[in-house]
Swiss-Prot record:
Protein's name according to its UniProt entry: Virion release protein
Organism the protein comes from: Fowlpox virus (strain NVSL)
Protein family per UniProt: Belongs to the poxviridae F12 protein family.
Signal sequence extent: none
Gene Ontology biological process: regulation of DNA-templated transcription; viral process
Listed InterPro entries: Poxvirus_F12L, TF_DNA-bd_sf
Length: 630
């Protein structure tokens, strides 16, 4: 989903201010301040967390543009038939790569392999790619539009790569036409998901209930940006690292290299297989910069919000405390935990201003209080959830809750998706975004769950290792690939196409709970194509004693959302799962559990909208745990 679409689906009304400052619909990167001290980076990959964690108080600097360096994930597989091929990336280079592989064009394959990390080439148009082919003496394989050849008399060079461009649901798709004579433009696209591969046994791992003691090798750090040198890149002015290290340099590459050298020194000194770098709002600055530049350094890899030191195999976890804390900024976070009022400005207009700041302020004090806050925060989470340690792979509060429940229940028969095919299938089945019908205005009203737990406690959740089938069994939990057709009189469908929510005919992935709900609501034609199904199911949230102790014994806190405890319980009760859905592919996750949690909530919400009091209302936006209406 493009950045503009995600902003439109957001609960916050931030799109209009962004457009005022120059944001365009095709932009995919935003640099903006949120207050006098904090600069963040918004991309298509972190915008769900932006709208969850950030409160925009003051925009004093704003810049947006389209960057070819931003790579977004796509849960769909390519469309590959006998007559045509459509890459899910929409990249023309991927069409050339596919043709080189299928037709065994070794010269073209070698040329493409040498350009694997060339983002500009990957996003090139037909003219630019043909220039590249000419440069490499490969013009025989040039891209030619099917509209420019005579199909009837077959008067075209068979070595050329024939391309068609179609518009489906308002989007343009590039197609490699394999068979010019037999080809017809598809009316609608069925993006396939490899469900058979997703169910392969080694793509699912047992959920470990072990947890390590709190890692002692924890270091707070911050990146400080400067804004004067370029419009389309963040310039790192300095890096602060606990306890008192200040890293500066000639340019971004030099500063990051010194930073990585410092980390390497820590790794060898501590002789540990893991260390933890912690901070606040890392997702919106530090992680984005590291992911952008780390490929330049052969001894390091950035993967799944962590750095890996190739020589030793040491993992450097990047732990963003903001994900486990109410919406705030670094100043408010430190004040909450230490009572200390400090400025935490993370950007300067000029390099000279940053240099003056470093010379005239105690950076060591700043980083010390951030370190102290992070330690107290993590220790508080351990105490509240009665953990024996802390896992820096925890994706969010729901992840911690489910882990603690499983430990209490001592149930070890849950498998989580590990391989990208299985992860992508689970993500495709989770519908947490808004179905937006109209814009929010001053007359809009919101209906929000105070607690989702009465809905999800009675529900069943997958257990065991899933298997493949085309005929799901009644009473079993499954996730199905379906062809769906929606009646035109349904304004707010429970089954919809994520890529184009206005589509009335599409292929989608839904849980058995979603499908059962749609059947009961009526107005849907559903054809199940294939499924992933679980052999067993359990009531995960039926440990009443533990949940009562967790929520009821802390009820005094739940009325005060400014306290950490109050925020934790309010957040969990309302069923917010943004960060858990964004769980990294290599980490332990709860995606199949979350998929059914969301489905049980959607089941209740959409049935509620059938009640007369809401049926006559004008629904503006709707998602699993809230409805906005007029």
């Amino acid at each position: 989903m493009a950045l503009i679409e995600q902003l439109q689906s957001s609960e916050q009304s931030i799109l209009s201010p962004f457009r005022y400052y120059g944001f365009k619909d095709f932009h995919n990167v935003i640099f903006t301040t949120i207050d006098d001290e904090t600069l963040i980076v918004i991309t298509v990959n972190n915008v769900p967390l932006v709208t969850r964690l950030i409160t925009f108080e003051k925009i004093t600097f704003f810049r947006s543009f389209n960057s070819t360096c931003i790579i977004t994930s796509n849960n769909n597989s390519d469309i590959d038939t006998d007559t045509y091929f459509i890459p899910n990336s929409l990249s023309l280079l991927d069409i050339l790569k596919k043709r080189a592989y299928d037709v065994e064009l070794r010269d073209l394959s070698f040329a493409i392999m040498s350009e694997m990390n060339n983002d500009e080439l990957r996003n090139s148009d037909i003219v630019s790619l043909n220039k590249w082919l000419h440069k490499h003496n490969l013009l025989d394989y040039k891209l030619v539009l099917i509209s420019d050849i005579d199909r009837r008399y077959k008067l075209y060079n068979k070595k050329n790569t024939i391309i068609d461009v179609i518009s489906v649901n308002g989007r343009n798709y590039n197609i490699w036409v394999k068979d010019v004579i037999e080809y017809y433009s598809p009316e609608y696209l069925r993006w396939s998901i490899d469900i058979k591969r997703a169910t392969e046994s080694n793509n699912w791992l047992p959920y470990s209930q072990s947890i390590n003691p709190l890692n002692e090798n924890i270091y707070a750090f911050e990146f400080i940006a400067t804004l004067e040198r370029s419009n389309e890149r963040l310039n790192i002015g300095a890096i602060f690292l606990y306890p008192d290290i200040i890293i500066t340099g000639r340019n971004n590459e030099d500063i990051i290299e010194k930073f990585l050298d410092q980390l390497e020194e820590v790794i060898y000194k501590k002789n540990s297989d893991s260390i933890v770098l912690t901070g606040y709002h890392l997702t919106f600055l530090e992680n984005t910069i590291l992911e952008r530049y780390i490929s330049k350094y052969k001894d390091w890899i950035f993967t799944c919000n962590r750095l890996v030191h190739c020589k030793t195999g040491t993992e450097v976890f990047l732990f963003d405390a903001a994900i486990f804390f109410p919406s705030s900024n670094k100043k408010g976070y430190v004040k909450h935990w230490t009572g200390k009022k400090l400025n935490f400005k993370n950007f300067f207009q000029k390099d000279s201003q940053l240099e003056k700041y470093i010379n005239n302020n105690s950076v060591a004090e700043r980083i010390y209080y951030l370190q102290s806050s992070l330690h107290k925060h993590i220790s508080c989470l351990i105490e509240i959830f009665e953990l024996n340690g802390f896992d820096f792979n925890f994706s969010g509060l729901l992840d911690i809750l489910i882990f603690s429940i499983r430990v209490k229940n001592n149930n070890g028969n849950y498998y989580y998706p590990k391989h990208s095919s299985a992860v992508n299938l689970m993500l495709s089945s989770i519908y947490t975004d808004y179905y937006a019908i109209d814009d929010i205005d001053k007359d809009s009203k919101k209906l929000v769950f105070n607690s989702i737990f009465p809905l999800i406690m009675e529900g069943y959740y997958p257990e065991g290792k899933p298997y493949y089938t085309k005929t799901p069994k009644e009473g079993y939990l499954s996730i199905c690939l379906c062809d769906v057709e929606i009646s035109n009189d349904i304004k707010n469908p429970i089954l919809y196409c994520k890529e184009n929510k206005s589509a009335r005919k599409f292929t989608g992935v839904f849980t058995s709970v979603d499908i059962d709900t749609a059947v009961k609501l009526r107005g849907y034609k559903i054809k199940i194509l294939e499924c992933i199904e679980w052999p067993n199911k359990i009531k995960l949230f039926d440990n009443i004693c533990y949940l009562n102790k967790l929520f009821i014994e802390h009820q005094d806190y739940t009325h005060d959302e400014k306290s950490l405890q109050g925020y934790l319980f309010s957040y969990l009760l309302k069923g917010n799962v943004t960060e858990d859905v964004l769980a990294m592919k290599s980490c332990r996750n709860n995606l199949s559990i979350i998929s059914f949690i969301i489905s049980y909530c959607r089941n209740y919400t959409y049935k509620l909208l059938e009640c007369p009091v809401y049926e006559s209302s004008n629904i503006v936006k709707c998602k699993y745990n809230q409805v906005i209406y007029k």
